[in-house]
């Protein structure tokens, strides 16, 4: 009998039921930005002040940056430490959807903004001190952290770092404006809640294997990171 070189994934033998349930959840809620009629928001957009338009553009620019990093670096960083082949399949799904999220913001821009406005948004995003600091803090962990640290960085990004940017479009939705833009944000939030929960769960599995002293030291590192990110958000 020849030696096994590569193993086929068997979805009939599940090592962790959370892998299967997460896969099913993510595939059930699959969506694409092209299905949302963003042009229906043009009347609302024209009624916003220039300051409001500038705010919305910069908020979405920042969110695009985070989704780009997560799709290019974040998922790859935690892929090396998967426990099951099904976990890797889930991460493949997450990585693709992060690219969908990043692309959806460009769909919003192309619908609401002029070419020069879009260029200005990305110029600001790629050079803003605090956005770039946020990206550097997270990406440094992706490049140099251990397996648990990478999962913490990913979970923090998937949760509160994204959610601070979601406030603005949801605020306008609450005022009956930009409903279709907000629909995209709601779909992204639905995805991110699953992404953050899943990666956080995988973190807990590894964290529970640490000694009590190791857990205490890790908690200290984790809260230091949280406060560092929070301080940057305040700026």
Predicted regions and their residues:
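Non-heme di-metal
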Residues: 1-235
């Amino acid at each position: 009998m020849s030696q096994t070189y590569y193993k086929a994934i068997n979805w009939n033998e599940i090592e962790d039921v959370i892998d299967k349930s997460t896969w099913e959840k993510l595939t059930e809620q699959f969506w694409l930005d092209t299905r949302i009629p963003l042009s229906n928001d043009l009347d609302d957009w024209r009624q916003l002040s220039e300051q409001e338009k500038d705010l919305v553009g910069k908020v979405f620019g920042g969110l695009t940056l985070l989704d780009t990093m997560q799709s290019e670096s974040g998922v790859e960083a935690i892929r090396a430490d998967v426990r099951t082949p099904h976990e890797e399949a889930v991460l493949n799904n997450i990585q693709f959807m992060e690219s969908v999220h990043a692309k959806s913001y460009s769909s919003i821009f192309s619908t609401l903004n002029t070419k020069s406005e879009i260029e200005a948004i990305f110029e600001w995003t790629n050079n803003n001190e605090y956005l770039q600091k946020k990206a550097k803090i997270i990406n440094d962990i992706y490049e140099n952290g251990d397996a648990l640290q990478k999962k913490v960085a990913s979970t923090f990004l998937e949760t509160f770092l994204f959610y601070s940017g979601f406030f603005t479009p949801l605020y306008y939705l609450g005022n009956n404006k930009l409903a279709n833009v907000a629909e995209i944000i709601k779909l992204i939030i639905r995805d991110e809640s699953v992404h953050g929960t899943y990666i956080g769960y995988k973190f807990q599995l590894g964290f529970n294997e640490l000694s009590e002293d190791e857990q205490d030291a890790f908690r200290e590192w984790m809260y230091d990171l949280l406060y560092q990110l929070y301080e940057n958000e305040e700026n």
